């Protein structure tokens, strides 16, 4: 589809992504309304607008570069200041609500399938793909698409609907903590801590106070991040080459799980080195803002209307069912709201987008735990997707 900026205009696209990320951060720290909305939402929503008015292309190698290189570099930078013992404490609670959210995906898939099975071709295959994807992530989506041999045009239409749904759900999840009803009915200790840290004036501006940072800090942050990513990619690639079982390739061969685990191990072994590094949070957060811009770009309403209106309804039912089940169970079992929202994000969008949300909201204690727990979805997603797809096919 034609756009003002072509998909191969690399420098212009990089310029737009970086400038819009900077504008989003600037607005968040300058205006109270923008701080309330959050810079992440401004970055994402602005990118959606620019796509839908025909300025940005829906696809480009530049966006792939952000996913392949920028996001992996951001992850260790954002983990350098964490408390390793706190990670394992938080992970137990997150694991429980993550599994509840996965049940929400399954229930939503069943509901959506029986409502729409007469109206969408190959819905058994699409149902298997989305069931796997909304527990794990894009890796599971691709695996199920290949397994069920879903026709290419329906895979493409589902990807379009899924991209739009993910952007919409991210907007909903990141906005929920600001709503009074949720503040009255759920515990929100992490959100309250962020507000307390920035209790005067603009909370975002107060949270991101100016810090001393030296050339050595920048060099050591960058060097450590690049080294950890490089080693993790090699290790995960090696494990993928020697193991064939999906369970092993899905854990030991997953680059994000290896990267997160290796980073946590190194921080545990050399805590004083990383405690003395300044600027890691700031550098990592800016990289994540580039990611926020990129995930908003594929949400093209024109493609939705043309190719996938009913599939969008299908994925919407599943995502909202996941959210509703998670909120209800979370309330029943007194799970903290931040953990519920991150679990929903991790199931529907994968651990990377969940970690990005935790970063955007300032819930730094939950970044590493949700990355670790979210990768569990990669393991169980394919099993659930296979079962659901085969079961759905018996009704067609």
From Swiss-Prot:
* Main subcellular location of this protein, as a coarse class: membrane
Keyword Cell membrane attributed: yes
**Xref: InterPro entries:** DUF819
Annotated membrane topology:
Multi-pass membrane protein
Q: What is any one of the record's Gene Ontology cellular component terms?
A: plasma membrane
Record keywords: Cell membrane, Membrane, Transmembrane, Transmembrane helix
Q: Keyword Isomerase, does the record have it?
A: no
The protein depicted here goes by the name Uncharacterized membrane protein YjcL
Which organism does this record belong to?
A: Bacillus subtilis (strain 168)
């Amino acid at each position: 589809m034609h756009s003002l900026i072509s998909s191969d205009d690399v420098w212009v696209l990089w310029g737009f992504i970086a400038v819009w990320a900077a504008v989003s951060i600037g607005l968040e720290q300058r205006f109270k309304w923008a701080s309330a909305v959050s810079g992440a939402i401004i970055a994402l929503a602005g990118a959606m607008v620019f796509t839908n008015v025909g300025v940005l292309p829906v696809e480009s190698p530049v966006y792939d570069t952000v996913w392949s290189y920028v996001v992996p570099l951001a992850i260790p930078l954002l983990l350098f200041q964490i408390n390793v013992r706190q990670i394992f404490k938080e992970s137990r609670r997150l694991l429980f609500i993550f599994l509840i959210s996965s049940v929400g995906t399954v229930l939503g898939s069943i509901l959506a399938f029986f409502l729409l099975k007469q109206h969408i071709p190959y819905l058994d295959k699409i149902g298997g793909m989305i069931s796997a994807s909304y527990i794990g992530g894009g890796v599971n989506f691709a695996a199920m698409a290949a397994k069920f041999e879903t026709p290419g045009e329906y895979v493409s239409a589902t990807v379009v609907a899924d991209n739009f749904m993910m952007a919409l759900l991210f907007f909903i999840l990141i906005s929920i903590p600001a709503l009074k009803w949720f503040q009255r009915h759920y515990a929100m200790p992490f959100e309250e801590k962020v507000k307390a840290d920035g209790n005067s004036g603009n909370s975002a501006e107060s949270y991101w106070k100016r810090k001393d940072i030296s050339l050595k800090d920048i060099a050591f942050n960058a060097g450590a991040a690049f080294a950890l990513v490089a080693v993790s990619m090699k290790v995960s690639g090696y494990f993928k080459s020697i193991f064939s079982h999906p369970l092993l390739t899905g854990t030991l061969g997953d680059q994000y799980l290896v990267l997160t685990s290796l980073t946590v191990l190194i921080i545990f072994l050399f805590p004083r080195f990383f405690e003395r590094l300044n600027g890691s949070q700031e550098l990592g957060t800016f990289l994540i803002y580039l990611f926020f811009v990129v995930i908003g770009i594929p949400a093209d309403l024109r493609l939705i209307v043309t190719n996938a209106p009913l599939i969008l309804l299908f994925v919407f039912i599943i995502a909202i069912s996941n959210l509703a089940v998670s909120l209800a169970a979370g309330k029943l079992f007194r799970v903290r709201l931040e953990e519920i929202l991150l679990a929903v994000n991790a199931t529907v969008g994968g651990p990377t987008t969940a970690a990005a949300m935790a970063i955007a909201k300032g819930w730094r204690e939950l970044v590493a735990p949700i990355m670790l727990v979210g990768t569990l979805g990669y393991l169980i997603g394919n099993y659930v997707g296979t079962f659901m797809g085969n079961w759905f096919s018996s009704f067609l």
